Amino acid sequence: MPANEYHFITRWRVEGTCGEIADVLDDPVALERWWPSVYLRVEELAPANPRGVGRRARLLTKGWLPYTLRWELEIVEQRYPHGFSLVASGDFEGRGVWTFEQDGPFVDIVYDWRISAEKPLLRSLSFLLKPLFEANHRWAMAQGEESLRLELARRRATSEAARRSVPPPPGPITYAAAAVLGGVAAAGAALAYLIVRSMRRR
């Protein structure tokens, strides 16, 4: 696999129904509101057709590392309420598949995400910092799971007072904190790379 190609499988287990999960995750425009730690801005480019596919959105996203990603998604397959598939283009290109399976009062959620990083920073440094970029993705998805639980609680609230009692979703990490964390992690990754390279030369 080329250094700039990534394959992530994320698993969440959330109390609710497949319909509830699909109604939240199938709406890219709402991501900016309920998953603000990652989705900084979302602009709808085209609505879905009657079959629920063709919806397109332009996104600005970030993790805890001090860089942003500009990309577009299009929903290309709809299996409501059991999931959907999307294609991505821009700073990364590839395909994502969401799958929802009911298990009693819970929903097992799987996100299969295969992409190539096309942002110049990621393309040029993936050979060295791929573990760091992977950790950045895992952090983003962990934020998503927490934010999804909070969004479901808000939607289920039966009064405005109950809705206000639900904590807000975690917001984006500041660039100052991200720079410190990213610098420490990058230094550690670079040191590990140099050690491995030195050992291979012996």
Positions of the model-derived regions?
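Hydrophobic ligand-binding cavity/cleft-lining segments
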Residues: 1-50, 191-202
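Terminal "cap-and-tail" regions of soluble proteins that handle hydrophobic small molecules
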Residues: 2-4, 14, 103-202
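Short, surface-exposed charged micro-motifs
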Residues: 11, 74, 97-99
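Hydrophobic pocket/interface hotspot
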Residues: 20-25, 31, 57-59, 75, ...
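Surface loops and adjacent helix of pleckstrin homology
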Residues: 36, 89, 112
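Glycine-rich portal/gate segments that line the openings of hydrophobic small-molecule binding cavities
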Residues: 43-95, 106-108, 143-147, 151-158, ...
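A short, polar/proline- and glycine-enriched secondary-structure boundary/capping micro-motif
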Residues: 68-70, 95-99, 119-125
